[in-house]
Structure formats: structure tokens, C-alpha cells
Amino acid sequence: MDTSVVDWRRVRIFIVFAFGIAWLAALAIYLTGGLAGSPYALLLLVVGYMGAPALAHILTRLVTREGWQNLYLQPKIRQGWPYWIIAWIAPVLFTFAGMAVFFSLFPQFYDPSLSAVQTMLENSAEATGQAVPVLSPWMIVVTQTITALLIAPLLNAIPILGEEFGWRAYLQPKLLPLGGRMTMVWMGIIWGLWHAPIIAMGHNYGLEYPGAPWLGILAMTWFTFVLGTFLGWATLRAGSVWPAVIGHGAINGIAGIALFFIQGEPNLVLGPSIAGLIGSLPIALAALAILLSRNALKLPSLDSREKVQEVFTENTA
């Protein structure tokens, strides 16, 4: 197989499978009540939607008889351990930094009393028939942060692998002959548009914002570009998909904490979540640093170090 040119046939087949399976799951969610009302929403999201890229990867290899080399599933911890750590810790830092930027620009939406946490505790107590626990809302935030940092990346690993085994372990290597920077652009666009049906149903941003759902889809595409650049970089440097799985799982585990600090009705397309246009600025700066670094997105090992350097030089000249 010629690894110096894009295998567009396999790219197209993969995209058809990844979008087709996921969007069918989204249709099932929509027809059974939407994200908020469907009794099957969680199952369809985790299995049908998030699992679609991994299934697309497997189906594409089967249909095209590609074989099972270069799966990116080996952990390669000795080679890539720094990128495991970065991918594990950085999402929490990006999230809180993004919240700080958003609330500094829109202080009227910041609630230092964390009344949203107290409301959550009261609703939970009412649903279970128990007394409202006497807990500081800040203790809940600290506990949630520690859980997101230490446990969420592991708990989320299996469903997140459903995405990353498709995006970072298959599509990204297929597009790398375009050059590292262009690969990240196309990965962001494809990954963002893949989310379109659930964004149109209110995922991440709700629907109470100007330009819904199109502005939300655009914001999500921006977020998948900057997040995808970070995850793609970690994958390439580690030579394994697992740092991307850990990083993506950490993002999913911590992103919702921004809602604890909200009062009023901010435009969620802007923030304070890391998926917002303003909330994503810290990770966007990290992505910019990666994109501006000449060797950050170099091609992974092919047959030898010399082959890597030869192909990378050709694609960045």
C-alpha cells in the first residue's frame, strides 16, 4: 500500500459507514422522543452513535480487505507515557481556564453561591424521598473535579474508544499524506459535521440561541477542530490511540461542571463550557501551538525512521 498518498476510496467508505450508522441512531432518538424524551436516548447515543466510528473502521477494513495492521491499539506506554499524562490532566486545566475567560467577559452569569448545585441536591432528595444532604456546594464541585480527573477517563474509555478507534486510529492516518495541518482541518470538519443531528436536537448548546441549530453545528465544528488537533497530536506522538481515548474521556467527564457556576441564561454556544466558542479558547491556544510547531504533527512510524522523515519532508515542503 502506498502511504504517501491519500487512499480516498477507503476514506469515503469509512465516512459513509461512520455517518450512516450514527445518523440512523440519531433518527431513532428523534422518532422516539428526542434527546430529552426518548427512553432509548442514552443507549442509542453510547452504542449506536459513539460506537459508529469504530464499527465503520472495522467494516471498512473488511469490505476493502485491508487487513489488520496499524490499528493503533498497542498502548506503547514506554514511548508515549508523557502524552498519556498530558492528555489525562490538560482537559481539566483547559476547562477551568475557559470558564475563567468566559466569566471574566460575562460576570453577570457567574454565580459564586453555586445555587445550581443546591438545586440539584434538593431535586435529588425530592426524587429519593430523603433529606437534603448538608454539603457545601463547593465540596460537590471539588469532588466532581477529582472524579473527573481520576476516574472519568477510565470509566469513559470503552464508549470513547468507539469514537477514537475510528477517528484517530483510522481516518487520521488515512488523511496524513495531506500534511499534518491540513489533516487536522479536515478531521475537525468531518468530526464536527458528524455531530450535526444531535446538535440539532439540543446536545451541548440547547436550542435557545440565535441561529439554532446552524450556529451550534458551526461551534461544534470549531470545537472538534481544536480538540481534535490536541487529541491527534497526542496520538501521533504516542503512536497509540489510547492517549486520545483518555483525553476525550477526561473532556467528557469535566465539561459539564461549568453548569454548576451559571446563573441567568448565558448563550451556551459561547460558553462557559469548553465546547463553547469562548470556553474553548485555552484549548484553541494549545491547538495553535501544535499547528505552528513544524514537527508536532509529523507522520507516525511507517517502516523505518528514514521512511518517516522522507514522507514527512515531502508533505511539508
Predicted feature residues:
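Short, Lys/Arg-rich, polar N-terminal cytosolic tail immediately upstream
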Residues: 1-8
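Membrane-helix interface linkers and caps
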Residues: 2, 30-36, 42-92, 101-123, ...
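Alpha-helical transmembrane segments
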Residues: 10-23, 86-94
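C-terminal membrane module of polytopic membrane proteins
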Residues: 62, 207-217, 247-317
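Hydrophobic alpha-helical membrane-insertion segments
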Residues: 85-109, 187-190, 232-237, 241-248
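Membrane-interface interhelical connector segments
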Residues: 125-130, 199-212
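Hydrophobic alpha-helical transmembrane segments
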Residues: 126-156, 217-227, 280
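Membrane-interface helix/loop boundary segments of multi-pass membrane proteins
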Residues: 160-193, 232, 236-240
